[in-house]
Amino acid sequence: MDNKKYKRACVMVRNIKISVVKVRRILDHVRKYSLRNALMLLEFLPYKGSLVIYKAIKSSYFNYKNFWDFNVTLDNLYITKAKADSGPMLKRSCPHSRGKAFPIRKRTCHITSMI
């Protein structure tokens, strides 16, 4: 018995040099759409992270296609899970007034998409 409810494909993109807050803002637009609508939306969003998320979702589509069903189309699949978690932080310092060092935290994130 073949149950399509449990067939999923997942992709994790790690250590992206974009802040988690910026990526979550884009993922909030994309969740619960069909893949065709989500990819179309990501093409026209003017944010830096939309290209990375576009590639991650497209990769999860091809993983699903290769592993489960070769004849599946973009309209039949939906994004079930899309999240961004914080990654390791690169810590730098910048000289500040009166001989102090001012910390600079370059944030990274991990993106997980599941269809």
Swiss-Prot record:
GO MF: rRNA binding; structural constituent of ribosome
Membrane-crossing segments per the record: none
Nucleotidyltransferase in keyword set: no
InterPro entries attached to this UniProt entry: Ribosomal_uL22, Ribosomal_uL22_bac/chlpt-type, Ribosomal_uL22_bac/org-type, Ribosomal_uL22_CS, Ribosomal_uL22_sf
GO BP annotations listed: translation
Cellular component terms (Gene Ontology): large ribosomal subunit; plastid
UniProtKB keywords: Plastid, Ribonucleoprotein, Ribosomal protein, RNA-binding, rRNA-binding
Major localization class: plastid
SUPFAM superfamilies recorded: Ribosomal protein L22 (SSF54843)
Highest taxon in the source lineage: Eukaryota
Localization: Plastid
PANTHER family per the UniProt record, alphabetical: CHLOROPLAST 50S RIBOSOMAL PROTEIN L22-RELATED, LARGE RIBOSOMAL SUBUNIT PROTEIN UL22M
Subunit relationships: Part of the 50S ribosomal subunit.
Family matches, as NCBIfam families: rplV_bact
Family from the record: Belongs to the universal ribosomal protein uL22 family.
Free-text function comment from the UniProt entry: This protein binds specifically to 23S rRNA. The globular domain of the protein is located near the polypeptide exit tunnel on the outside of the subunit, while an extended beta-hairpin is found that lines the wall of the exit tunnel in the center of the 70S ribosome.
The protein's name in its UniProt record: Large ribosomal subunit protein uL22c
Protein species of origin: Euglena longa
Species classification: Eukaryota, Discoba, Euglenozoa, Euglenida, Spirocuta
